[in-house]
Amino acid sequence: MTVLQMLSESAKRGFDIMLAGIGLLASAPLWLVVALAIKLEDGGPVFFVQQRAGLKGAPFSALKFRSMIPDAEVGHGAVQARENDPRVTGVGRVLRATAMDELPQLWNIFRGEMSFVGPRALRPGEIETVGSGTIEMLEDVGGYVERCRVRPGLTGLAQVYAPRDIPRRLKFRYDRLYVRRHSLWLDVRLILISFWITARGSWEVRGRKY
């Protein structure tokens, strides 16, 4: 790693710590509202904790507000939520549309396990069914190792620009592009666009999000 790259990474990490700290303090009242709404709806747990692959593939516990029914994967397995998925709760639909279900990941960012901008954090050993019905391990897809060279993020090129319903392995193209060209200015731009998408509540739409 060159001196310039080291300075860039230090600036990115400092930016993450500052913004995550401000976000945690500013959003504290919202956490209480969301937690109360989740509890009142079905009485289940407020948070959902799941192992994800982080920087260089190291596992960490990603924290989210629960947006599905309790034990949603029992009988279904690790199946990604689909449009109008019956496992998603009423409160969960609002949280997903505005990305507020990922608000607790500010803590993951503050701890250094995630960044504000980067590839989406995947589960270790995550699989995907390709068009022919073949099961494919995402870790075996070209570009997986390269996307692990940076911390996973709340938002990123793939999250903002890739169509929501394309296979994740195709989103790796966006992730690889980010890894090669990321900068603090690109991060700021993606964060601002993400705020706009959140304000519109359009994270779950099929087409253009903003």
Residue map of PLM features:
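Short loop-to-helix capping motifs
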Residues: P29, A99-M100, E113
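Hydrophobic structural segments characteristic of membrane proteins
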Residues: W107-Y210
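Short, glycine-rich, amphipathic interfacial segments at transmembrane boundaries or analogous
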Residues: V46-R87, R93, R123-P124, E128-T129, ...
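A hydrophobic, helix-centered structural microdomain
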Residues: T2-A72, N108, S183-Y210
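Polar-ligand-bearing catalytic/cofactor-coordination segments
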Residues: V91, D101
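Short, structured helix-loop boundary elements
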Residues: S8, D85-V88, R151, W185
